[in-house]
Structures are given as C-alpha cells and as structure tokens.
C-alpha cells in the first residue's frame, strides 16, 4: 500500500526551467498546499529512522524547516537552522554551498563542540547542500549521528557518501519521466 507521500508525489505538477524538470510538491516547495496529514506522515516516518538520542536536529533554510519543526515537537529535540544570512554571532560557521542550480553561503549557529546531531532536509539531488552542512558541522565539532532527506532525486546520495563518508537515509527515491514523477523505491 502506497503512503501519502508517494501518492502526493505521483500527482504533483512538473515545470520545466531550461533543461531541468522541477517537481512542485508541498514538502520541497511549500506549494500548492501543505496538508497536516502529509507532514505528519513524513515526520512520523523520519522519527522511526533516526537516532533520537541526540542533542539537536539541523536543517538548511528553507524547506527543511516545516519538517524539522514537526519532528522537534514530536521528539522534544531542539533544532538549528543553517541560514542564508550572516548573523555575526560568536561561533558562527560560514560555509559555501553549491548545488546543480545555485550557489551561495550558509551560516551555522547554535552548535557546540561535541553536540550529537541529526541532519534533516527535504530533497537531495546533487548533494551540494548536504556536503556543505556536513563540513560546517564537522568544523564546529559536532558528532553527526544520522543524515536524512525526505526525497531522493539524482545521484546526491552517492556524492555525499563519497565526499563525506556519511550514508544518507531517504523516505522515497524518484525520477521525473515524461512529465511525471516516478517512484523508484
């Protein structure tokens, strides 16, 4: 039996920008509408696959925020958001991020040496964001216990493991074929 996430992916709209086909989905884009049932399905599944004996959950701005909030509320684990804006706080860790479609800076605050963390994000495609997050957390002295992305599209999991040594857990693997999302696993 397919779950809510998989069903919603198979029916989501696809838009083409240049050579790239983007799937538009509530988990990855916050549009057209984020239904509480979908967020509950995703967060419940994430909680079952992560080490909950951690100090903090880390995500990148912006679409990891709804997911990390739901997981945080359900587990009582606080979370940290890697922001796209510099705050100039003591201990802030800047990191350059490059994906297949953008590049820029992320800034990590609120992580102390020895913090046990789970990384949680919405989509992995090129792996660029996760590689940047992992490097920033290692520079800050964090102990990374799990790395999780909801949707796997592309070769990002392999790239992250090759460049960082961390395996990325995902809920669903997809590809866009003939203008539709196809569930691979």
UniProtKB/Swiss-Prot annotation:
InterPro entries: HGPRTase-like (IPR026597), PRibTrfase_dom (IPR000836), PRTase-like (IPR029057), Pur/Pyrimidine_PRTase (IPR050118). One of its GO terms (molecular function) is hypoxanthine phosphoribosyltransferase activity. Pathway: Purine metabolism; IMP biosynthesis via salvage pathway; IMP from hypoxanthine: step 1/1. The keyword Cytoplasm applies. Pfam families: Pribosyltran. It comes from the Archaea. It catalyses: IMP + diphosphate = hypoxanthine + 5-phospho-alpha-D-ribose 1-diphosphate; GMP + diphosphate = guanine + 5-phospho-alpha-D-ribose 1-diphosphate. Keywords: Cytoplasm, Glycosyltransferase, Purine salvage, Transferase. Homodimer. Belongs to the purine/pyrimidine phosphoribosyltransferase family. Archaeal HPRT subfamily. This is Hypoxanthine/guanine phosphoribosyltransferase. It comes from Methanococcus vannielii (strain ATCC 35089 / DSM 1224 / JCM 13029 / OCM 148 / SB).
């Amino acid at each position: 039996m397919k779950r809510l996430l998989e069903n919603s992916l198979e029916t989501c709209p696809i838009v083409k920008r240049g050579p790239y086909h983007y799937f538009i989905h509530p988990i990855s884009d916050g549009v057209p509408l984020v239904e509480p049932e979908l967020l509950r399905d995703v967060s419940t599944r994430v909680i079952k696959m992560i080490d909950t004996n951690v100090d903090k959950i880390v995500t990148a701005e912006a679409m990891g925020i709804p997911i990390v909030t739901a997981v945080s509320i359900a587990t009582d684990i606080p979370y940290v958001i890697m922001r796209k804006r510099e705050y100039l706080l003591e201990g802030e860790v800047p990191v350059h991020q490059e994906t297949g479609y953008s590049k820029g800076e992320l800034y990590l605050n609120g992580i102390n040496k020895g913090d046990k963390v789970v990384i949680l994000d919405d989509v992995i495609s090129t792996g660029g964001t996760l590689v940047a997050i992992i490097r920033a957390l290692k520079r800050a002295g964090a102990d990374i216990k799990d790395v999780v992305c909801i949707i796997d599209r592309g070769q990002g999991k392999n790239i992250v493991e090759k460049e960082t040594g961390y395996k990325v857990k995902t809920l669903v693997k997809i590809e866009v074929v003939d203008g539709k999302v196809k569930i691979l696993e």
